[in-house]
Amino acid sequence: MIQEGTRTSADAVAALPRLTELLETATVAADRAHARYSGYQVGAAILDAWGVIHAGCNVESAAYAATICAERGAVAAAVAGGAGDLIAIVTVTRDLDPASCCGMCRQLLAEFGQELLIVNGSLTSDRLRWGTVADWLPNGFLAASLETAPLPAGPHAASAARD
């Protein structure tokens, strides 16, 4: 269930004891965002099972499809840094209402477990919204979906069966 509160609400702190540190790291990352086209700065901070925090920010490109969201940047930094299991990700924007992760980021976060905690925060207010990947992406397309997928029908079905 997706919950709402503030940076100091007991529920938020109980859900993620290092919340303040993660919010600070995400804020620094947001300030470093390369958002020259939209001006929309997003920062992210991931906590791994070893207690290491990995940061990411959005990086925009004139070729819009090449833009990298802060969440995907943080995941890439965590994986490249040899992270343990991912425990939580905190994102921040300057919106009054916390902005949620886009669908592509939710899908990528699902690769790291349905219980991964996602916390979205506002730098303009102290509002937060949080829940697990399963809350944010119900019935997501997961690795198990590939294991049960039927073979394709059509002209290439025979070659797919041989591969």
Question: How does the language model describe each region?
Answer:
Residues 26, 43-44, 56, 74, ...:
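Small residues (Ala/Gly/Ser/Thr
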Residues 37-39, 68:
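Short glycine/proline-enriched turns and hinge-like loops at secondary-structure junctions
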Residues 39-48:
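Short beta-strand scaffold segments in enzyme catalytic cores
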Residues 2-35, 81-163:
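C-terminal binding/interaction regions
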